[in-house]
C-alpha cells in the first residue's frame, strides 16, 4: 500500500534492481554527517541517545543512469539531481541519526536497500521545543520522497547497516517533486 501524509513524505511505486554487490555501488566518500543541529540538541534534553555518523558516497555512472531513468523527464528538465549512496550503522540501543534538516538539499528521493525496520520521525520545532508530528517505516526496496526542510531523524537498530541510494534536489521543493509521482 502506498502511503502519503501531509507535507513530510510520500511513498512512490518505483523499483530498482541493483546488479552486483553493494560494495560495487559506492565509490569515493562524499561526506560524513556528524554535525549537531539545534533540533537534535533539543531532543537530547528528553531522550538519551548517541548520534551515529552517516557517510555518503559518490556512485558509478551506471548507477546514476539507472536511478535517473526512474525519474520523469519533465522533472529532470527542471533539475538534474545529484545521486549518492548512504550507509550508517547504529552502535547500540541509543544510536540514532539525530533530528536535523538537510542544509544543502530541500528534497530527496530515497531508494531504500536495507532499512532494518527502522522508522523515520518528523518533528515540529518551535521556540526551542521539538515535538514529533509524523513518522514512517520504510521497507527494503521501497522508494520514498522526503521533505528535508522539516526536522527528521532515524532511530537505528544496533549493529545493522542502513543503506540507501538518494537523489538530492537542491532547488526543486518537495511539493513540486511529488507532483510528478501521482
State what each model feature region is.
Residues 80-150:
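Catalytic core of non-heme Fe(II) oxygenases with the double-stranded beta-helix
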Residues 76-77, 114-117, 172-174:
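Secondary-structure boundary elements
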Residues 1-81:
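Non-heme Fe(II)/2-oxoglutarate
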Residues 124-182:
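Catalytic core of Fe(II)/2-oxoglutarate
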Residues 1-5, 74-77, 99-103, 135-137, ...:
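A general structural signal for short secondary-structure junctions and capping/turn motifs
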Residues 9, 106-108, 162-164:
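Short hydrophobic/aromatic beta-strand or adjacent loop that forms the aromatic wall/cage
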Residues 68-70, 77, 121-123, 176-180:
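Short, charged, solvent-exposed linker or helix-capping segments at domain edges/interfaces
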Residues 16-18, 113, 167-171:
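Short beta-strand-to-loop capping motifs
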Amino acid at each position: 500500500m502506498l502511503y502519503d501524509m501531509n507535507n513530510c513524505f510520500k511513498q512512490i511505486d518505483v523499483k530498482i534492481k541493483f546488479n552486483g554487490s553493494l560494495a560495487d555501488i559506492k565509490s569515493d566518500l562524499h561526506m560524513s554527517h556528524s554535525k549537531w543541529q539545534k533540533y537534535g540538541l533539543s531532543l537530547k534534553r528528553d531522550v538519551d541517545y548517541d548520534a551515529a555518523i552517516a557517510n555518503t558516497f559518490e556512485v558509478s555512472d551506471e548507477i546514476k543512469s539507472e536511478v535517473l531513468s526512474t525519474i520523469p523527464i519533465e522533472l529532470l528538465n527542471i533539475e538534474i539531481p545529484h545521486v549518492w549512496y548512504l550507509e550508517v550503522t547504529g552502535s547500540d540501543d541509543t544510536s540514532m541519526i539525530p533530528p536535523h534538516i538537510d542544509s544543502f538539499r530541500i528534497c530527496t528521493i530515497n531508494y531504500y536497500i536495507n532499512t532494518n525496520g527502522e522508522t523515520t520521525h518528523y518533528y515540529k520545532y518551535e521556540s526551542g521545543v521539538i515535538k514529533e508530528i509524523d513518522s514512517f517505516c520504510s521497507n527494503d526496496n521501497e522508494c520514498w520522497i522526503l521533505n528535508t526542510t522539516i526536522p527528521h531523524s532515524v532511530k537505528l537498530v544496533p549493529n545493522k547497516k542502513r543503506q540507501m541510494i538518494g537523489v538530492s534536489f537542491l532547488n526543486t521543493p518537495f511539493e513540486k517533486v511529488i507532483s510528478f509521482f501521482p
